[in-house]
Amino acid sequence: MLRHFVPLLCLCLLAVPAWAQSDTVAEPAAAGPAPEKILVVGQRPGPGLWKISKGEHVMWVFGAYSPLPAKMEWRAHEVEAKLSQSQEFLSPPSTGIAAGYGAMTALPFMVGFKNNPDGAMLKDVVPADVYARWLPLKAKYIGENDGIERERPMFASDELFRKGLAHAGLSGNTGIDKKLYEIATKYKVKVTRTGVTTKIESPVKTIRAFKKSTLNDLACFSRSIEQLETDLDAMRIRANAWAKGDIAVIESLKFADRGDACADAVMTSVV
């Protein structure tokens, strides 16, 4: 069940009998999911918490999801109550890049880093059939923008996907991770980060090499287009289901996420 939630955010604490009695379980949906045109707004609780225990040790698991309704605000009362009494907060798994103090010296070299090498256009670097699918989506969600045709597939598809979500009333910037860190900081809970960060020793050299390199980002581009073509309605249903805590609906929907393909394009580049 938990495979449907990315990332998993864990709240680790000692067991308290009263909590075991108040563990929240979402009620199953009465019927299968149907196309939804209206997204939920206002404060919503999300799916609640899952309890994992062994002896006196208890771990509360919170399943995050993205994108969510742009006008929804996560109501964090239940999670705050558990996290405030926790011994440790495990951050969601992630990958990142750190440039250190040399980042400032690399700023002048960042100009044009999103563009394809040697002045190539998008139509020159992606398969013709995929580019033909890109054009109507670009017209619908982005509009006139010649500059984006010079960008690498990964960056162009990211802009397209972001605009597509906004058009559907969704947002990938959920603010949930930030809220969890704020709660942990407020109650002085130990934070254990589970992400992996790649340190760049020479940012200027890396940027120069990156601008000349060819990325393995066609899968990212293709999956972004596929998800906008086939999964947008399902994303709206999942977003509403997460906001309402309707786990049965979330479990019933399958989807091909673009996230892994796009993350791989970055982490397997010259960086």
Where are these predicted regions, by residue range?
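Positively charged n-region of N-terminal signal peptides that target proteins for export
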Residues: M1-H4
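Bacterial N-terminal signal peptides
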Residues: V6-P17
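Boundary at the C-terminal end of the N-terminal hydrophobic targeting segment
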Residues: A18-S22
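Structured, acidic catalytic/metal-binding patches in enzyme active sites
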Residues: V25-V270
